[in-house]
């Protein structure tokens, strides 16, 4: 089992201690039961073999009806983290399939987040409604809502996962990218777009064994016999099993490995490895796709960069100490041929 550190959230670790080298994942958690969703992601990442640090986020513009104070105390909002860099972004599902996108109270902010992630995140993963919405904004596909719910556990081209949605992405609606899994009945289930390092998943690999059952019982209480029973899920004695767990772990393991092998977003997406403004060591390390090193005054490192990012000045003073060896390693990870000028105690 690998180490998963929850820096915030309703199930936050009491004393978070991130593992050196852990992948930094931002989760925009839009699911109704956020605590359960946090636990589901922690469980699946723990089984991947990759150390992971999770930060949970909410749209600032979302009007939360219940327990708003508790959620805002536990979660970051997008404006609070938008100056940070992450290895991965996950946008979860949300019970919004039957609502027009423009009726979602945080729709404008969600579009802003999707633009932001192209320069601040190495890889993005969109789930269920999150995939439906992101695919439309990104121009990867155009899905549509459907009157009958797709619910159950389905195996498509070797991938077994739960589906729970009121939308369909027809195979013919894919504008770019690759359909990894899909069929005529379920539509595109997994789509990847390498141009933005994005993966769109119509289902819920992260679901626990009982999640579909709980959703079904909830729908029964609301709609009675009209509630559709999940297909290929319940056994004859009304039990269920976690038939997708192995596929889920394998999927997330591959996703984390792909993030590890990819370039930092600033180098890959903007054509400029670093901006021409000073950065703290923390921001530079995140931009390089590395975990910031531990040490005193680590955030006082000053980077002065030329417009072409071919030279960097490191200033080390008694008041603001810089670990030059680690700074050098980070800079050469970003730009192997970069020229580094080090100034110590005011003397070049």
Language model features by range: what are they?
Residues 1-58, 75-81, 85, 112, ...:
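Amide-donor transfer/coupling interface in amidating biosynthetic enzymes
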Residues 58-63, 129-131, 344-346:
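Short beta-alpha junction loops
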Residues 60-72:
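N-terminal beta-loop-helix "entrance" segment that forms/cooperates
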Residues 71-72, 92-95, 236:
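Short glycine/proline-rich turn/loop motifs
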Residues 333-347:
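Short, mixed-charge low-complexity intrinsically disordered segments
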């Amino acid at each position: 089992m690998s180490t998963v550190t929850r820096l915030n959230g309703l199930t936050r670790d009491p004393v978070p201690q991130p593992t050196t080298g852990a992948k930094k994942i931002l989760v925009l958690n839009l699911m109704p039961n956020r605590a359960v969703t946090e636990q589901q992601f922690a469980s699946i990442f723990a089984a991947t073999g990759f150390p992971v640090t999770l930060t949970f986020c909410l749209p600032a513009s979302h009007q939360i009806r219940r327990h708003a104070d508790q959620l805002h105390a536990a979660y970051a909002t997008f404006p609070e983290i938008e100056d940070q860099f992450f290895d991965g972004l996950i946008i979860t599902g949300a019970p919004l399939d039957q609502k027009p996108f423009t009726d979602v109270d945080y729709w404008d902010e969600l579009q802003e987040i999707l633009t932001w992630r192209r320069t601040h995140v190495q890889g993005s993963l969109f789930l269920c409604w999150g995939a439906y919405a992101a695919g439309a904004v990104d121009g990867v596909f155009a899905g549509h809502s459907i009157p009958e719910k797709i619910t159950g556990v389905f195996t498509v081209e070797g991938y077994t996962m739960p589906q729970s949605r009121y939308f369909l992405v027809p195979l013919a609606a894919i504008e770019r990218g690759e359909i990894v899994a899909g069929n005529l009945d379920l539509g595109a289930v997994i789509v990847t777009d390498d141009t933005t390092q994005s993966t769109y998943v119509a289902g819920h690999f992260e679901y626990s064994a009982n999640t579909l059952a709980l959703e079904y019982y909830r729908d029964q209480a609301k709609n009675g016999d009209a509630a559709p029973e999940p297909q290929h899920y319940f056994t004859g004695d009304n039990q269920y099993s976690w038939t997708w767990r192995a596929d889920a772990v394998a999927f997330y393991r591959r996703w984390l490995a792909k993030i590890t092998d990819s370039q930092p977003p600033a180098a890959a997406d903007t054509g400029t490895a670093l901006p021409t403004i000073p950065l703290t060591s923390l921001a530079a390390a995140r931009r390089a796709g590395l975990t910031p090193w531990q040490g005193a005054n680590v955030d006082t490192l000053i980077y002065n960069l030329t417009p072409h990012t071919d030279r960097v000045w490191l200033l080390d003073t008694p008041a603001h100490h810089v670990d030059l060896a680690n700074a050098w390693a980070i800079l050469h990870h970003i730009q192997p041929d970069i020229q580094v000028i080090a100034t110590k105690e005011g003397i070049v």
